[in-house]
Regions:
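Aromatic-rich carbohydrate-recognition surfaces in CAZymes
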Residues: 77-106, 172, 299-324, 387-512, ...
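Acidic/polar, glycine-enriched structural segments that form the non-catalytic walls/loops
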Residues: 1-24, 29-30, 38, 132, ...
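The feature captures the catalytic groove of carbohydrate-active enzymes
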Residues: 157-159, 163-167, 232-234, 240-247, ...
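Short, solvent-exposed loop/turn and secondary-structure capping segments
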Residues: 50-54, 59-65, 91, 155-158, ...
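Non-catalytic C-terminal accessory modules of carbohydrate-active enzymes
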Residues: 59, 65-73, 78, 82-92, ...
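Beta-strand-rich N-terminal accessory domains
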Residues: 1-97
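Active-site core of glycosidic bond-cleaving carbohydrate-active enzymes
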Residues: 394-425, 463-465, 472, 476, ...
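Active-site acid/base region of carbohydrate-active enzymes
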Residues: 118-132, 140, 201-249, 333-372, ...
Length: 760
């Protein structure tokens, strides 16, 4: 039986039965002949990853610390099967070397090796961290593969293991015995990653058989579990001749980086066999410059604190592979089986977690990390967009995207918060990044914090992000000791943020900083004076800070927060309400004013309500403007909500410059937050449909495992692997009709996912 039905529609969410699952799953199928831009990555937290393409080749690779620029796409096939001297390379991409040529090996008694064949198609179901593939060939066997990485919500140590397993299912549906060979190929690290072209190769025997390929900077192990007839050799790559003779020989290798491993098999009629390959890697040090030859500082991966080397990882996986896969299926089954969520959202909640291996990095508490850092914490960070805007912990990105970390890996989220606190400036200002491209430092630095852009930084919103993330952790854990640890930092930032425009009196609470020398999250456009989007975020920050002050008994600051709330709210409502919507901005000092609609104006409302607090705008006006947004910004996009528009239609060039958002740009994370705001106000169908159409467009365009930050702005897409999209994991709290902590309580979705993954 195949791992999943192969006759399902392409790129359409549906439910179906699948191998190992007791109930129907939710998912969508891609195909190798119409492949997505990137396949699903294999990896965990801080491990780097290797993209497994729907075409049956390796894609981008960061496992050996080619972080920026990424190595790849490698575009080499990795799996092939041979029966009767006929090899099928299991990829829809034809080999470039000697394709279509037969040849005779005179050294093997004139053995005739037939021209290699490729797969005519591949059916591909990604359900991170698992990718299931079914291959279409004319071979006398049917072949499927389940590839997976150890990613278990709630188990940070196991999810920190740099490894992947490839389970290849061979099925003989003929009436005769089929003998042959299955071969797996891996290129290993390149010279820049390894720092050498000479590798030590050590044979591995025991519960698994294969080879360890070692260098000072990068090593890996490739083995087959429980097989007696195993051969190893050099990388097969794109060499059709090498693939064609895998039944008899593999490429000679003495000290090279690449490896192939072959397992011989014999299947009686109707028989099936599963051959399991383990790939474990170990590249303990990365350079903040993004590549190992970069000019940044060196950091040591947290996984190197847990595991001694690649062989230790491989041995652990070999001994526990059945348990780990069972646990993965168990936690996924909780999501797939919860009929309170629409099918598309169940699948998206599973697959959006792929952004964690694509963007996460975790430094040990060793120099250049300061001595403020606890050994057990290290410094965990996410990279905004490794291939487009590489920088660590851009604070609004984590504001959008750290929900699954808070829920499933709070150790990592707390590590990040402690770094933000350590890097906070004496003024109370929060750091913008830990290091990276927008501030002129290398792209993977963890200890080069900066307040932001040299001109017009996002300072006015950075504090709201920081306070929100602290409140998230407090609400999720219920730990008042954590609150006490961060309270002074939160208070100092809130005071700093509310005094960025002291010359405007009460209006300064909900305005741009003095001189308008700042940017909104929706950057690259000019805003002036009172800005409802910024004001709403400020008021949400104050509400959170007030609750914290109340909890620690700081009544004086409670009164200060009450004063800010009353004054700021009065200014927003009296100065910027235009009857059907809030203005984009209004600067009383100069008379500058814009009637343009910003469809994501209610981000602060979403923040407050998600945290179980009273909203920050008048509820009746929120409802009125949500209706305005529906007939304008949402109506103008076939799949989302445009960021900016006029009350009567699209922006013209003469109206105002929206920067790279253009007249039709959509921000997927912002659209998801807007969708949840509709849910907060009782419009569940509207909100879920809006979010579904946005995610559906991402799927349609082949970006499911390569999600952008902007669609149809000044370019069809802006950004790759944007972890802001992890904001999807705030949907469970909204769907459960409660605050951010609700999914963690007994019987909540997060609670059930963690328990299933630990108990299976």
């Amino acid at each position: 039986m195949p791992l999943f039905p192969t006759d399902l529609p392409e790129r359409e969410w549906c439910q179906f039965n699948a191998e190992g699952f007791s109930r129907r799953v939710c998912g969508l199928i891609h195909r190798g002949t119409n492949a997505p831009l990137c396949g699903m990555p294999l990896g965990g937290i801080d491990t780097g990853c290797l993209d497994l393409e729907a075409t049956g080749v390796w894609g981008y690779c960061s496992m050996f610390n080619s972080l920026n620029p990424r190595r790849g796409a490698i575009n080499e096939p990795f799996l092939g099967a041979s029966v009767g001297k006929q090899t099928w390379v299991l990829s829809t991409v034809a080999l470039s070397r000697r394709e279509g040529q037969e040849w005779i090996d005179t050294m093997r008694s004139w053995a005739n090796y037939r021209a290699v064949k490729s797969a005519s198609d591949i059916h591909y179901w990604g359900h991170f961290p698992v990718a299931d593939l079914e291959y279409e060939t004319d071979a006398p066997l049917s072949i499927g593969m389940r590839a997976w990485a150890p990613f278990i919500p709630g188990d940070v140590a196991l999810t920190n293991a740099p490894a992947a397993v490839f389970e290849v299912h061979l099925r003989n549906s003929t009436e005769t015995e089929q003998k042959g060979t299955l071969a797996f190929s891996f290129p290993g690290p390149n010279e820049g990653e390894a720092g050498t072209t000479a590798f030590r190769r050590v044979k591995i025997e025991g519960a698994a058989t294969g080879v360890s390929v070692e260098s000072p900077q990068a090593s890996y192990v490739l083995t087959a579990i429980g097989e007696s007839s195993v051969r190893t050799g050099g990388c097969l790559g794109t060499d059709a001749v090498a693939w064609s003779c895998i039944e008899d020989t593999l490429p000679f290798v003495e000290a090279g980086a690449g490896t192939s491993i072959a397992v011989d098999f014999a299947l009686s009629p109707g028989a099936e066999k599963t051959i399991r390959f383990v790939l474990a890697w170990f590249a303990p040090v990365w350079n903040g410059g993004g590549i190992m030859t970069g000019k940044g500082q060196d950091y040591r991966h947290m996984y190197a604190r847990r595991y001694a080397n690649a062989r230790a990882v491989a041995e652990m996986i070999t001994g526990r592979h059945e348990e780990i896969l069972r646990r993965i299926i168990a936690w996924q089954s909780v999501l797939y089986g919860d009929e309170g969520y629409p099918v598309w959202l169940r699948d998206a909640l599973v697959n959006v977690l792929h952004l964690i291996p694509e963007t996460s990095i975790w430094a040990q508490a060793k120099p250049p990390v300061g001595d403020w850092c606890n050994e057990e914490d290290g410094v965990f960070g996410m990279n905004e967009s490794p291939r487009a805007c590489p920088q660590i912990e851009c604070i609004p990105c984590s504001f959008y995207g750290n929900f699954p970390l808070v829920y499933f890996f709070p150790e990592a989220a707390l590590s990040t918060l402690r770094a933000y606190k350590a890097y906070q400036y004496p003024s109370g200002q929060a750091p913008w990044v830990f290091g990276g491209c927008t501030v002129g430092s290398p792209p993977y630095e963890m200890a080069m914090p900066s307040p932001g852009y040299a001109k017009k930084p996002q300072t006015t919103l950075d504090g709201g992000c920081y306070v929100d993330m602290v409140d998230r952790m407090w609400r999720r854990t219920g730990d008042d000791q954590l609150l006490r640890e961060f309270y002074d930092s939160v208070k100092r930032n809130t005071i700093f943020t509310m005094n960025l425009r002291p010359g405007s009196g009460a209006a300064g609470i909900v305005s741009m900083p003095e001189g308008n020398q700042a940017q909104d999250w929706f950057e690259s456009c000019d805003l002036f004076g009172i800005v409802p989007h910024i004001g709403g975020v400020h008021l949400a920050q104050i509400r959170m800070a007030r609750r914290m002050a109340k909890a620690v008994g700081d009544e004086e600051f409670v009164r200060q927060c009450d004063s800010w709330l009353a004054q700021g709210s009065e200014v927003l409502e009296n100065e910027t309400w235009a009857g059907t919507h809030y203005l984009l901005f209004k600067e009383k000092e100069t008379g500058k004013e814009s009637d343009i609609i910003m469809s994501y104006v209610f981000d602060g409302e979403w923040m407050a309500k998600l945290h179980g607090l009273e909203g920050v705008f008048r509820p009746d006006r929120v409802k009125t403007m949500l209706e305005t947004i529906r007939r304008t910004a949402i109506a103008m996009s076939p799949f989302g909500s445009v960021v900016f528009c006029k009350p009567e239609g699209a922006l013209g060039k003469e109206d105002w410059d929206p920067g790279y958002w253009g007249a039709h740009g959509v921000h997927p994370p912002g659209t998801f937050m807007l969708a949840m705001t509709y849910l907060f106000y009782g419009e569940k169908d509207t909100g879920l449909d809006l979010a579904r159409r946005t995610m559906g467009e991402i799927v349609k365009r082949g970006w499911y495992w390569d999600v952008p930050v902007a669609i149809d702005g000044t370019a069809p897409r802006i950004g790759f692997d944007y972890y802001q999209n992890l904001v999807l994991w705030s949907f469970p709290a909204v769907m459960e009709g409660a605050d951010i902590a609700a999914p963690c309580k007994e019987g909540g979705l997060v609670d059930r996912v963690i328990k299933a993954g630990s108990e299976a």
